[in-house]
Amino acid sequence: MYPHSLFLGLTLYDIFILVGVVAAFLLADRMTVKRGFSVSLQRIVIICALSAVIVGYGSAVLFQAFYNIAERGKFVIDANTGATFYGGLIGGGGGVFFVFFFAGKHFCKDNEAVKRFPDMLDIGACCIPLAHAFGRLGCLTAGCCHGRETDAWYGINMYNYTNGAGEEVWHRVVPIQLFE
């Protein structure tokens, strides 16, 4: 839809991802307070969320690089590699489990981290889809993933490529991100 940079090199994709992550962090903070988590466990939840973002993004790019082997014929991680949701979910989830139980064992009293783990899963079940929804809207604005070309009423114009004459070529496609 609009894959161009707006300001400071940021695109709408970057802005939507940032809004999604901030919204998920704020929701996690609100839910930990409402559920009565101790201050030390709240800090651990924030560290878990940060580790999920960092490790999740790294694994999302890594998983996409494996998918790209079929297209490029070699394993390459560069600016065009992209990211996959499932790679981020697996890596981010693994990072959260490790940090939550390791830090919980060392910094929480009375085994609170283990007792509150079901609550932590509930919080994650709310925050992950929230961040993902904003991310999918960002993906829609980037025009990186879409369905087939269509003439249906629900099709939207998306940037496809720039031809040899330097003109942008747009196609009406199925907006898969809006259906997820």
Where are these regions (language model features)?
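Hydrophobic, membrane-interfacing alpha helices
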Residues: M1-F179
